[in-house]
Amino acid sequence: MVKRIKVVVTGANGFVAKNLRKYLSKNNINLISISRNDFKEYNDELKIISKNYDEKIIIDKIKNSDVLIHLVGIGKQSIHIDYEMINVEFTKHIVNLAKKAKIKKIIYNSGLGVSSKTSVGYFISKFKAEKIIMNSGLNYTIFRPSYIVGKDDLFTKFLKKQIKLKIIEIPGSGNYSIQPISINDVVKVFLQSLDQIKFKNKIIDLVGPDYLTFEQYVKLFSKDTKTKIKKINL
């Protein structure tokens, strides 16, 4: 009998995680999913609810799993919660949990545009998180996705809200290129990365096949809605 791969997923309630868990479950992956808040589990999925990802609650349940997929992160900060707290320090906590649980591989969802030369706070925090993972001694795969699009994705929700207001605000010129990628393609690559050797200790950009400018994407999305496009100087 072939041994089922045992995978731990953090941030189980998020857009990417929900789609990924569904896909992994259909592909006979043994799932352990963790979230701060309650969620509906799939058949044969172990659900863990822990507000602070408490080691005492989690460690025995995830011990000796094959892979941990870390999907917790924020793209917007406030006075109550910031990039350093979630994207950096929390990643450090998750890496420590993985090592204590004797998990050999970690997969991290970073972001397209992350580099050592960035001056943007969000990308800086993601770069720091990547370094924590790369220096952990664990086998790792880091994905840097472009806009991930699909049912109920955050970017689509944002644009729909703006359309209701009859105006979409574009940061800057809008002439910068994007390569949106379907969530259906993303989950397939995540599944492949669980055990294929070509993904070992790699950083991989996840982008769709089509280039278009941000302004073009917004115009296509809002076509036939009589929505005004407004550019915001940065």
Regions found by a protein language model. Give the residues of each.
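NAD(P)H-binding glycine-rich loop region in Rossmannoid oxidoreductase-like domains
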Residues: 40, 49-101, 112-117
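N-terminal Rossmann NAD(P)H-binding glycine-rich loop of SDR-like oxidoreductase domains
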Residues: 2-27
